[in-house]
Amino acid sequence: MAGRSIEDMSIAFIGAGNLATNLAKALYRKGFRIVQVYSRTKESAQELAQTVEAAYTTELQAVTKEAQLYIVSLKDAAFVELLPQIVSGKENALWVHTAGSIPMNIWQGHVARHGVLYPMQTFSKQREVDFGQIPFFVEGNLEEDVRLLKDIASALSEKVYEASSEQRKSLHLAAVFTCNFTNHMYVLAAELLKKYGLPFEAMLPLIDETARKVHELEPLAAQTGPAVRLSLIHISEPTRRVVIS
């Protein structure tokens, strides 16, 4: 890339789901050149491709061989299953995946240059996020590619870190507790409130204050209520049944 800016790189996205959609749009807005989007679903591939002014395909064998960087953002099982087909004929490019739970060595034996570009955030197609505050964790098998991935991530975010596969696995697990399990608690709360004719909106100030607290306090110090003692004594019988079940 000597003499050229990183924005001149030709990038292909393998996947057009929640993360891929947000990441591709963010890169496009920063001037990066997205040349193609692949998805098994035509609607998803076409919609994202139109947004970032790229070509699209729903056939793996039609994925361009001309891109310099391939960003794979698929469900874990699909990625592992399709990996040999995905890289076929394109082994000399730089390949990265965006998964928190998949180690970098998944690429070994398939491509020479490889790494990970992991933005740790929850993504939805319908909701755009501020990438400036999203932590990116990068890893690469070659130091020059680590620097390149850091430069790409730094074009989007102020928070860019190197992390090993082992570290990233722990990050991902912590993120599951912080986000996915927390949201599942909201689902249980919403079901309980609905059963008794109460609006979930009543919980929003509580949710917001709980989140704000941990910006200033350690999570343990911020904990209040029966959970401090892991006690269900002061929780009503209907709620106890929900928690226990």
Place the predicted regions along the sequence by residue:
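Rossmann-like NAD(P)(H) cofactor-binding subdomain of soluble oxidoreductases
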Residues: 42, 52-128
